[in-house]
Design a protein with these regions (language model features):
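Divalent metal-coordination and catalytic microenvironments
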Residues: 3, 32, 64, 105, ...
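Active-site environment of divalent metal-dependent phosphoester hydrolases
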Residues: 10-14, 39-40, 70-74, 119-124, ...
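Mid-to-C-terminal alpha-helical segments outside catalytic/metal-binding sites
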Residues: 1-3, 199-213, 219-263
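Active-site-proximal beta-strand/loop segments in catalytic clefts of secreted hydrolases
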Residues: 6-9, 33-37, 66-70, 114-118, ...
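Active-site gating/metal-coordination segments in enzymes
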Residues: 15-111
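Catalytic pocket-lining loop regions of alpha/beta-barrel enzymes
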Residues: 24-28, 86-214, 242
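An N-terminally biased module of ancient metal coordination in phosphate/nucleic-acid-related enzymes
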Residues: 1-23
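Well-ordered, non-membrane alpha-helical segments in soluble/globular domains
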Residues: 12-19, 45-50, 93-99, 124-126, ...
Length: 263
């Protein structure tokens, strides 16, 4: 078994050392990613780019953890302090700093996790599509399938060969969004009331079996506490697919995209 992990940082380098220490004692288990940074302001800054590029080489990171482009504000106690007047965290994908970062990181040949939620499709799809086209040799991974619809997932995956998605948090509908308009824009979850894969999602998982990755989004203590339950839920989901498809999504695609060498 392997698990891909990255630190979550509200200041540059926060929690990075702790994860490196954890990896030092679990090298056969952990696949390291560069830290996710929460405090980008409208664009990616030079200090983030410099530090991330340096540490990709220093620590042999296999991917860049989530670049937080869009994130709708949630209405729950764990998100207090992260509400915004606009109802979202937003980092413009067409920014100069984003382009500068990708020009440099694309030479490292590792994927970049691109956290984009599809609640403002008309604004964001043209910009992200251009971004993916501008950097055809850079692999991008969209977590949670963007919480989008089958139609949106199909359009992105069929248009851009260099874009992949994780299936984390897609077992059920996205909830707890403060803005009801944004809430209404999220796509459906995978499962019906009988815990069976909806036909429209099953078609997507089979058609794009080479571009989808299992993930749990175990980013806080409450997610780790139910980690085993999350894994069981997704085993039940993948067991509803042909075996060769489930193996790709469960681990084979991750081995390829993170360049994991089996011992």
């Amino acid at each position: 078994y392997k698990i891909a992990l990255f630190a979550r940082s509200k200041k540059l380098g926060e929690n990075e050392k702790a994860l490196l220490n954890l990896h030092r004692n679990n090298k056969d288990l952990i696949v390291l990613g560069a830290p996710k940074y929460f405090l980008h302001e409208n664009d990616i800054g030079k200090s983030f780019t410099k530090r991330t590029l340096k540490n990709i080489d220093k620590y042999k990171y296999s991917f860049v953890g989530e670049i937080l482009f869009t994130h709708a504000d949630k209405c729950n106690t764990s998100s207090i302090g992260r509400q915004h007047e606009s109802g979202e965290t937003y980092l413009d994908p067409s920014g100069k700093g984003v382009a500068d970062f990708l020009v440099k990181v694309s030479s490292k040949n590792i994927p970049v996790m691109t956290h984009w939620e599809f609640y403002d499709w008309e604004r964001d799809w043209p910009k992200f599509s251009k971004l993916f086209l501008d950097f055809p040799n850079q692999k991008f991974i969209i977590p949670h399938m963007g919480f989008g619809s089958p139609k949106q997932a199909k359009l992105i995956l069929s248009t851009h060969d260099n874009v992949y998605m994780t299936i984390s948090k897609k077992n059920k509908d996205k909830r707890n969004i403060c803005d009801p308009i944004k809430q209404s824009k999220f796509g459906s979850g995978f499962l019906n009331d009988e815990k069976q894969l909806k036909d429209e999602w099953k078609e997507i998982l089979i058609e794009y079996q080479d571009k989808l990755l299992f993930a749990t989004d175990a980013h806080k203590k409450h997610r780790w506490k139910k980690y085993s339950k999350i894994v069981r839920i997704y085993r039940d989901i993948l067991n509803q697919l042909p075996e060769e498809v489930s193996k790709k999504i469960a681990y084979l695609n991750a081995q390829k995209i993170y360049d994991i060498k089996n011992k």
